[in-house]
A protein has these predicted regions:
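Acidic/histidine-enriched, glycine/proline-rich intrinsically disordered or flexible terminal extensions
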Residues: 206-220
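GST-like domain detector, emphasizing the conserved glutathione-binding G-site
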Residues: 1-130
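Conserved beta-strand edge residues that scaffold enzyme active sites
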Residues: 41-42, 189, 207
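Residue-level detector of family-conserved "landmark" positions at structurally sensitive sites
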Residues: 37, 71, 185, 203-204
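GST-like fold's C-terminal all-alpha helical module
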Residues: 105, 109-197
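Phosphate-coordinating loops and pocket residues in cytosolic domains that bind phosphorylated ligands
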Residues: 51, 195, 204
Length: 220
């Protein structure tokens, strides 16, 4: 079996980096042993992180000579090398559906990213959400409700937590941080995600971090 010392996942701030959270959750869900390598948010790297510099590619998985740094690529790679984890749905149409909503998360919802950046240590009661971000929230809720209805929960694609849940987990934390009002079925799903052991572990670690970014206007 692959030892943890031979596989690394490079991530950045647990509190602020939603893509790091996604990659780490995917790696944990895969069951692949790995070592987490942190990129500190210091004065030298902060500007690059805020500008999404190509020289800072996080998360980045290194495994048996392969380097994979895009979150969707990491998801596909882990599904390939850890098939027993069933990160993607087994049925073809469900798998296509999963890839589509993950792609939508990967490339879309720019208003949400800008207006509600991830910040696990913060809480803003009665936060005022502008219309474009609200439109993104409504679309995400529609995606979740369709999946929970079609595949009967408790996770987006049925009985097993997978890629889609990991991709949308940082959005769940945003809804908590910014006090987004949700209907009971969606609130229940969010509570389920927050209670998932790997998600809870990441959040606990984020709350213990000391780094602060005063102005965060882009997701990394």
């Amino acid at each position: 079996m692959q030892s943890a010392g031979e596989t690394t996942l490079t991530v950045s701030s647990r509190n602020y980096s939603s893509w790091s959270m996604r990659g780490w959750l995917l790696a944990k869900l895969s069951g692949l042993p790995f070592e987490t390598v942190m990129v500190p948010i210091d004065a030298a790297s902060r500007a690059e992180l805020l500008l999404l510099s190509p020289s800072i590619r996080v998360p980045c998985l290194t495994h048996e000579g392969a380097k994979v740094w895009d979150t969707l690529a990491i998801a596909e790679y882990l599904n390939e090398i850890c098939p027993d984890a069933r990160l993607l749905p087994q049925e073809r149409q469900a798998r296509a559906h999963c890839r589509s909503i993950c792609g939508e998360m990967h490339s879309g919802f720019n208003a949400l990213r800008s207006a509600l950046p991830m910040n696990l240590r913060a809480h803003f009661p009665d936060f005022r959400i502008w219309s474009r971000a609200q439109h993104d929230i409504e679309r995400i809720v529609t995606i979740w409700r369709e999946c929970l209805t079609q595949y009967h929960g408790p996770w987006l694609f049925g009985d097993e937590i997978g890629v889609a849940d990991a991709m949308y987990a940082p959005v769940v934390t945003r809804f908590l941080t910014y006090d987004v009002k949700l209907e009971p079925d969606i609130a229940d799903y969010c509570m389920r995600v927050l209670a998932q052991p790997f998600v809870a572990e990441w959040i606990d670690a984020a709350k213990a971090e000391q780094d602060d970014i005063d102005e965060l206007d882009m997701e990394f």
